[in-house]
Amino acid sequence: MKAEISRRSLMKTSALGSLALASSAFTLPFSQMVRAAQAPVEEKAVWSSCTVNCGSRCLLRLHVKDDTVYWVESDTTGDDVYGNHQVRACLRGRSIRRRMNHPDRLKYPMKRVGKRGEGKFERISWDEALDTISDNLRRILKDYGNEAVHVLYGTGVDGGNITNSNVPYRLMNSCGGFLSRYGSYSTAQISAAMSYMFGANDGNSPDDIANTKLVVMFGNNPAETRMSGGGVTYYVEQARERSNARMIVIDPRYNDTAAGREDEWLPIRPGTDGALACAIAWVLITENMVDQPFLDKYCVGYDEKTLPANAPRNAHYKAYILGEGPDGIAKTPEWAAKITSIPAEKIIQLAREIGSAKPAYICQGWGPQRHSNGEQTSR
C-alpha cells in the first residue's frame, strides 16, 4: 500500500516534529536561561526633562533597570484636550536614552594631558576639576581683566531651567562682569526688530487661529522646527478645524507644514520676504484696504500725520511704499515679482485676501531673519 504525501501534510508533520524537539530535554539549558532572565529585577520610573538646546523642556518619564535607562516615555498625564494638551516630546527626547547610554558620553571631568588636537585626556576628580577652573579663572581676571572671559550659550543643554545660560552669567556678574554678546544665532535679528516695532517680542498664540478666516505663514515651518512638546503643529491643525481657515504657506521649500494641509503654497526666493511684504502693503494702500483709524491710534510714522515733528518730510512708511520717499522706488507687485520670483498677479491676489479677511492670522518664522538685513525682513 502506497501512501501519498502532500506538500501541506509534509509541512504539518515537520512543524509537529520541530515542536516536539523544542519541548524535549535538548532545551533544558535554554529553559534555565529563560527562567533566569525572568527573575524579578528592580524597575523604577523617574521624571526628567529633555534638554537638547531647545526651549520646550519636554517631560520625560525614564524607565530604569539596573541603573540603566531602557525605555523613555513622554507625557501621559491628564487629558490631552485642546487648550491643555499633553507635553509630548519629539524624537530627540524619545531617543535620549541613546545619548545617555552612549559609550562616548562624558561622565567625569577629563583633563588634557597632551598637546591641543592630540586627543589625550585623563580622568580627574571633581574637586581637582573645580580647583583647576577656579584657579585659572582667578588668574585670568587678575592678569587680563573681566573682558578676557567670554561665556558661550550654545552648550547643548541651554534650554534647561537649571542648566541654562543665566547660571554662568550670574556667576561672572558676581565676579565683576564678562564679555557678553548681542542676540543669538537663533533669533538675533527678529528679537531686535520686534522690540522696535511692537515694544516686545511676544506674539499671539497659535490657538488664535480658531478665530481667523485666513492663515498666512512667512517662512514659518512648525512641523519641522516646532515639533516638540509645545505642540504647535498639532495646535495649528486643531485650531484650523475649528475655524476652517484658509492657509497660505510662503516658503522656498515645500515643507512639512504644508505637506498637503495648505490651501496654497507660494515658493519665494530665499531672503526676499521683505520685498513681498512691501508689495502687499502697496496693494493695501492703493486699493484703500488699510485700517486707517487703527494706524492713526497705534502706529508712529505710518504717514505724515503721525510722523515725529523732527523727522524729514516724506520719511514715513506710506511714502516709502508709494515711492515718494528718499529712494523714489514704488514697491509695486511688478517690482517685487522680479525680486521674489512670485508673479505679480499672485502678489495682488495675496494682498487682497489679507485685506479682506477679518480677521487674519499672519506669522513669520525664524528662517527669513537669518539672512543679511534680516531685521528689515522681520519688520
Model-predicted segments: where are they?
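Long, well-ordered, tryptophan-enriched scaffold segments
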Residues: 242, 253-357
